[in-house]
Structures are given as C-alpha cells and as structure tokens.
Amino acid sequence: MTIAISRPRALVVRAPGTNRDSDAVFALEQAGADAHVVLLSEILETPSLLHNAQMLLLPGGFSFADALGAGRLFALELSTRLTAELAAFVAAGKPVIGICNGFQALIRTGLLPGASLKAALGPNDHGRFTCEWVQLQPVSQRCIWTADLDADIHCPIAHGEGRFVCDDNTLAALRSNDQIALRYSSPNPNGSVADIAGICDTTGLVLGLMPHPEDHIVPRQHPQFIRGHRGGIGLGLFQAGVRHASQL
C-alpha cells in the first residue's frame, strides 16, 4: 500500500551563479513541498542526499557564468558524476524540473529530450538577451507537471539562449510522444521551433522550460496587479509536481 507523504522533500540545486534558488523554494513551499536549497558540491560529494528527496529542481541563473555556453559546465558536473544517481531518481518515479539555466543543463546532459533524441537551446533569433512576460499554453497529457493544467500561465522569461531547436525527426518524435509540454501562446519571443517553451522526457517526469513560472506564484507578482490583473499564476504547475511526489 502506498502511503502519501504530506510534504514531499524537494531539493533545489544551487550551482555557482544560479540566482533563482529562493524563488524556486518559495514556489515549491507554496505548492506544499518541504523545499531545501542544496549546493551542487554537496550532492557531488554525497550523492545519497538524493535518496531522501522526492523532487529535484535545477533553477535558473548563470551557472558557472555560462562559461563555454549556457548550462554547459552545470551539465558536465551532473553527467560525469551523477549519471547513475539521476537515472535512479527518475526510475523511482520522482519528478525533476529544470527552469531556464536548469533546462539548458538538462538538455546538455541528455536527460531531455531523452530516448536518443537530440535538441539544443541556441541564441535567441534576434541576437539579444530578452526579459519580458509571456503566455504559456500547457499542451502535454504525458507530462505529470502539465497534464492537469487547464489554463495558460503568464510568467517572465529572462534569457539570451532560449531558442529551442531540433531536427525534423526529433520534432516529429516529440509530437507523437506528447513530449511538447508547453508552447508560447503569446508571440514567440526567441524563435523556438514550433513555439516550444518546454518539453518533457518519455516518462513525463522530467520537465524543462525556459520561462519562469516560479516568478508568478501569487497575483501581486504580476506587473499589472495594481491595474486589476488576475489569473495565469504558475502555482498549479508546481502543485502538480508536488501531488505526484506525495504519492511516492
């Protein structure tokens, strides 16, 4: 018999240069998780820290100053020293989410898209860092983070390398596997193929997205709040992950 965990333990991995750690903790706590920041160096030294967690979040920022490319060194640390542990984490049914720089790291590790598929996050098509609010449409029923969402999410983006690119075969596979988790329903801000804002792996447990739903968890965080704007908060996405993790 499965006994529900009232507050699943979530780890937010802080690498040198990540800067959305506190926002991520706030979002997870508001969604019902017991969230903790853990240093990447601590996990590398003691991988067993993952054993007692039910959720894992790789936050946004500029890990390792984006040296050699956004998320590359973050991914290198993960893929060379934690491959088996991360695979076991997902195999145990535990949800993982990477946001912005965290998404870039997941792509570079190969955890996304997974299943021998190849994709990348390249420089924005206009060649500039972009910081604006966007509208996201949840579209995947496979992804445990988005399957129960029935309304768009309005949240900010802040990136210079957020353009999702892949070849035609990978795009066809993502579509047929229902791995496209989120699309831009507002104008595409970076030239991502098929308006893709986020994807999941074939298990539906691992989600990566460029926008920052953790920055619109309560209505007052919206820039138009004082003008009466309501709705579109990103809390539901995190609540979905927490619901799944609480059953582990």
PLM region spans:
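N-terminal beta1-alpha1 cap of cysteine-dependent amidohydrolase-like domains
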Residues: M1-I99, F103-P113, P123-T130, V193, ...
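Amide-donor transfer/coupling interface in amidating biosynthetic enzymes
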Residues: T2-I3, E42, S48, L86-A87, ...
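Short, well-ordered, mixed-charge alpha-helical segments that flank or form enzyme active sites
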Residues: Q104-R108, G114-A115, W145, F164-C166
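Short hydrophobic/aromatic-enriched beta-strand-loop microsegments
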Residues: L117-A119
